[in-house]
Amino acid sequence: MPRSLKKGPFVANHLLRKIEKMNGKGEKHVITTWSRASTIIPIMIGHTIAIHNGKSHLPIFINDRMIGHKLGEFVLTRNYRGHGKTDKKARR
């Protein structure tokens, strides 16, 4: 179920403070975050945010087509490598 419009999008406070501070100074550094549930809002455009995938932080450049999506949608947490070629049990 989507979030109520009267509440507005969820963005972690620490992430919002860092982005507003960098926008005020005009800087562009990689921002590290564990907040995969934060929604991408227009002030994030042009920043690179390193999002945690459970093991490491992967840098993602934010563009205008990502607005409204969650940060966690762009970093996969599972690494599927496919089934083994010589595995006879999987073929049955």
UniProtKB/Swiss-Prot annotation:
InterPro entries: Ribosomal_uS19 (IPR002222), Ribosomal_uS19_bac-type (IPR005732), Ribosomal_uS19_CS (IPR020934), Ribosomal_uS19_SF (IPR023575). It is found in: Plastid, Chloroplast. GO terms for biological process: ribosomal small subunit assembly; translation. One of its GO terms (molecular function) is structural constituent of ribosome. GO terms for cellular component: chloroplast; mitochondrial small ribosomal subunit. Keywords: Chloroplast, Plastid, Ribonucleoprotein, Ribosomal protein, RNA-binding, rRNA-binding. Protein S19 forms a complex with S13 that binds strongly to the 16S ribosomal RNA. Belongs to the universal ribosomal protein uS19 family. HAMAP family: Ribosomal_uS19. This is Small ribosomal subunit protein uS19c. It comes from Nephroselmis olivacea (Green alga). The lineage of its organism: Eukaryota, Viridiplantae, Chlorophyta, Nephroselmidophyceae, Nephroselmidales. The gene is rps19.
